[in-house]
Amino acid sequence: MSEQEQKVEIPEVEKQEEVVVEETQQAEHSQEFDPLEEAIARVQELEEQLKTQIEEAANKEQDILLRSRAEIENLRRRTEQDVEKAHKFALEKFSKDILNTIDNLERALATPANKEDESVKALFDGVELTLKELVSTVGRFGVEAVGVVGEAFNPDLHQAISMQPAEGFETNQISVVLQKGYTLNGRVIRPAMVMVAA
């Protein structure tokens, strides 16, 4: 080979070597950054997963908190209602028992007697005052009488003993009250025993 040919080949070989070196460096450089870029991408992916998990956990905890608050509020409300009912109806048994006394005083006033006699009249007046005071006292605690002649029959408040035609009364009107009924704060503690017009 001539010197000139060698000179031509040398720069070309040098250029080729430079290209190979550059490619090698780029390959080495890209190999160095590929794992780094992969690691960065993986870290970002894991960060997103963690953010999602944290949001889900926060939402779950928020839901649990709201449910717990609602349960506490419901429990408080139920307890208040139970206490209120206990106050309202604590007197129910006592009221039922005292109704017999009221009935007996009313029967005593309904007995035929010589009311012209002063001693009998004084006795009746005393029984009447006692009855009024007793009815007034139980009334202050929510006990009210039900079952009045002429009022419409209500199966929630009245117990019909019989139905029979009665003059001056419409069908399903109370014609006779055999025993008064009573309610305690609107709740029936004893239905009125009545006869109903047919």
Swiss-Prot record:
Keyword Cell wall biogenesis/degradation listed: no
Annotated localization: Cytoplasm
Molecular function GO terms recorded: adenyl-nucleotide exchange factor activity; protein homodimerization activity; protein-folding chaperone binding; unfolded protein binding
Region (Disordered): 1-33
Primary residence: cytoplasm
GO biological process: protein folding
SUPFAM superfamilies referenced in this protein's UniProt entry, alphabetically: Coiled-coil domain of nucleotide exchange factor GrpE, Head domain of nucleotide exchange factor GrpE
UniProt-listed PROSITE patterns: GRPE
TM segment ranges: none
The family this protein is said to belong to: Belongs to the GrpE family.
Function description: Participates actively in the response to hyperosmotic and heat shock by preventing the aggregation of stress-denatured proteins, in association with DnaK and GrpE. It is the nucleotide exchange factor for DnaK and may function as a thermosensor. Unfolded proteins bind initially to DnaJ; upon interaction with the DnaJ-bound protein, DnaK hydrolyzes its bound ATP, resulting in the formation of a stable complex. GrpE releases ADP from DnaK; ATP binding to DnaK triggers the release of the substrate protein, thus completing the reaction cycle.
Assembly with partners or alone: Homodimer.
Protein name as annotated: Protein GrpE
